[in-house]
Amino acid sequence: AVSGGPDSMAILDFLSNNHKVTAYYFDHGTHFGKESYSFLRDYCARKDIPFVASVLSAEKPKGKSLEEHWRDERYEKFHDYNLPIVTGHNLDDVIEWFLFSSLHGKGKIIPYRNRNVIRPFLSTPKKSLLDWCERKKVPFLTDPGNDDKKFMRSVIRHDMMPHAQVVNPGIQKTFKKLVEREYNLLY
């Protein structure tokens, strides 16, 4: 699954150089979706990677945030494909998701595997994926929604994470150990 961001572009680059893959893109119906769709379609055409896109419904049910609605729709589509789906979720996402789910009374970490969805970068810091893209000259887009504070994830990323890192400068190492222990990952 690709969004055009550095995480998914790093994994697409890595996998497409070593395996036969298809890039799956989910358009959330935002203005940025049109830009990322064109970017990904063109990138995949240049690299000879099959490209499949789906448009998700922007109408959310009552009682759900837009983020939750989009995530639920994406995963429903993932399961419809009934093929292994690899995502670029990384260690920074694990920490953000833990904080997000803790604020909602759940306190879970992102599962390494969920049915047909596999997340091999869960113990990899986002910076490593950015470094990969820079080293390999892999282009990527930055979604302006990542800075939009109407989304809880942006508040966590830009407001809470800097404070968490002051309280525990080794927070990434702490969560890396948690992920590796939880999923018995050997790196």
Model-found features: residue ranges?
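ATP/NTP-dependent adenylation/nucleotidyl-transfer catalytic domains that generate, transfer
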Residues: 150-187
